[in-house]
């Protein structure tokens, strides 16, 4: 294969059979279970990179079921997302996500900079309870529960919240194994959102300590709200807003 062909066909690895296809990436009937809780403010600020700012010591613990996604297939994801501001405007910062499917794991890390690890999350309904769990190997590290569809939420308001920008710290190591080749803050949006439903109810969240899935490093001090959302949406491509290596 000549250099020109490599340059023109290169998208992702392996060159001749990429781990994921080009976008756009559309999600049908994407199901969110989000528990927002209050945590230790000093620990939280220590985990959020500047120039992002933390207005309140809050964390959104998410379980997300994606049964029908373009190119990525059928998978589930779980992790912690932090409400932040950037240049005075509200958004979110994804601290860590754990999922059970290779294409979105590879694509999420390589394209946007999603901090993804392989694990075993689940989101199910058992009779009258919405249940989210995260296992890292044989160890249960997160359990969330909520009363199933106790009260409807305003769809327009929930759509506005989903439309807020999400920020990611994208890090790609150099081939020397010692330094970062890429270290940048990226921003992406969920677009073309079609809301199917949104509900709330009484909720609980338990986090357990694990060396490699340290979700409990941001302890649960108080449950603030819980949301169950179903929507069709497209995960938009990203843009770089801050380059740490250029400073």
Swiss-Prot record:
- EC numbers: 4.1.1.4
Q: Which UniProt keywords apply?
A: Decarboxylase, Lyase, Schiff base
Q: Which GO terms describe its molecular function?
A: acetoacetate decarboxylase activity
Report the active site residues.
116 (schiff-base intermediate with acetoacetate)
Q: According to its UniProt record, which reaction does this protein catalyse?
A: acetoacetate + H(+) = acetone + CO2
Presence of the UniProt keyword Lyase in the record = yes
Enzyme class, first EC level, given as a word: lyase
Q: Does the keyword Cell division apply?
A: no
Q: What does this protein do?
A: Catalyzes the conversion of acetoacetate to acetone and carbon dioxide.
- Which family does the UniProt entry place this protein in? Belongs to the ADC family.
Q: What is this protein called?
A: Acetoacetate decarboxylase
What species is given as this protein's source?
Answer: Ralstonia pickettii (strain 12J)
């Amino acid at each position: 294969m000549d250099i020109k062909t490599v340059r023109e066909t290169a998208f992702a690895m392996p060159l001749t059979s990429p781990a994921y296809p080009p976008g756009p990436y559309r999600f049908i009937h994407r199901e969110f279970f989000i528990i927002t809780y209050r945590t230790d403010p000093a620990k939280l600020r220590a985990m959020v990179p500047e120039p992002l700012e933390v207005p309140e010591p809050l964390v959104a613990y998410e379980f997300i079921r994606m049964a029908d996604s373009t190119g990525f297939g059928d998978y589930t994801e779980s992790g912690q997302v932090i409400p932040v501001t950037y240049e005075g405007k509200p958004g979110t910062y994804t601290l860590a996500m754990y999922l059970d499917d290779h294409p979105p794991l590879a694509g999420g890390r390589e394209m946007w900079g999603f901090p993804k690890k392989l694990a075993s999350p689940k989101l199910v309904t058992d009779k009258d309870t919405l249940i989210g769990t995260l296992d890292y190997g044989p160890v249960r590290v997160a359990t969330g529960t909520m009363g199933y569809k106790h009260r409807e939420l305003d769809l327009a308001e929930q759509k506005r919240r989903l439309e807020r920008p999400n920020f990611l710290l994208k890090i790609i190591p150099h081939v020397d194994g010692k330094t970062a080749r890429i270290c940048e803050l990226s921003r992406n949006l969920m677009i073309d959102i079609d809301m199917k439903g949104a509900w709330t109810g009484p909720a609980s969240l338990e986090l357990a300590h694990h060396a490699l899935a340290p979700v409990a490093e941001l302890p649960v001090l108080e449950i603030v709200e819980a949301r169950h959302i179903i929507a069709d949406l497209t995960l938009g491509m990203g843009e770089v807003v801050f380059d740490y290596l250029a400073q």
